[in-house]
């Protein structure tokens, strides 16, 4: 589904995609030809049971393909960190894997809960999750990248103290026809 935002008769939106191993092999030249301007590529995850950090198996191909096709790229990492130290470990993993690529778009910290399952980070307090998020974002910023936080209404209203995260960009996930967010 494509959505265009029009302001004063001018399209103000940009076409982008997010990809991971689940999209399989991608023809990035075709993606560019379809008008896609940017992509967020999944860099990896921390396992919700094991806590093991795993690189997305298509990360390198997707980053190389996006860079070669001229599609501006950012990355995202799905966290299951349960301590500030684990968030710093995740950030170091992400930063180390970005060195070979052009990454003009943000490095995104995905803080969603594992629904219907027992994710290792599901029982964090708001303060713990906020501290973990700050630790990741500050490490990414110190490395010269733009940090961003991914979440939905639940993440941004019940799981994180947004007053402590105002300085970071947000990627707001909303899967309905009309956008709703109860805060500025």
Give the role of each language-model region.
Residues 16-27, 44-58, 80-89, 154-158:
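Acidic-and-aromatic substrate-binding clefts and catalytic sites of carbohydrate-active enzymes
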Residues 65-83:
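Substrate-binding cleft and catalytic face of glycoside hydrolase catalytic domains
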Residues 9, 28-35, 58-71, 94-103, ...:
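Acidic (Asp/Glu)-rich catalytic clusters
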Residues 27, 55-62, 87-90, 94, ...:
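Stable alpha-helical elements in mature extracytoplasmic
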Residues 17, 31, 66, 109, ...:
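Conserved, mostly hydrophobic/aromatic
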Residues 97-107, 111-184:
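Surface-exposed substrate-engagement region within the catalytic domains
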Residues 1-42:
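Boundary/entry segment of secreted carbohydrate-active catalytic domains
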Residues 15-19, 39-41, 71-77, 107-109, ...:
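Hydrophobic faces of well-ordered beta-strands that scaffold small-molecule active sites
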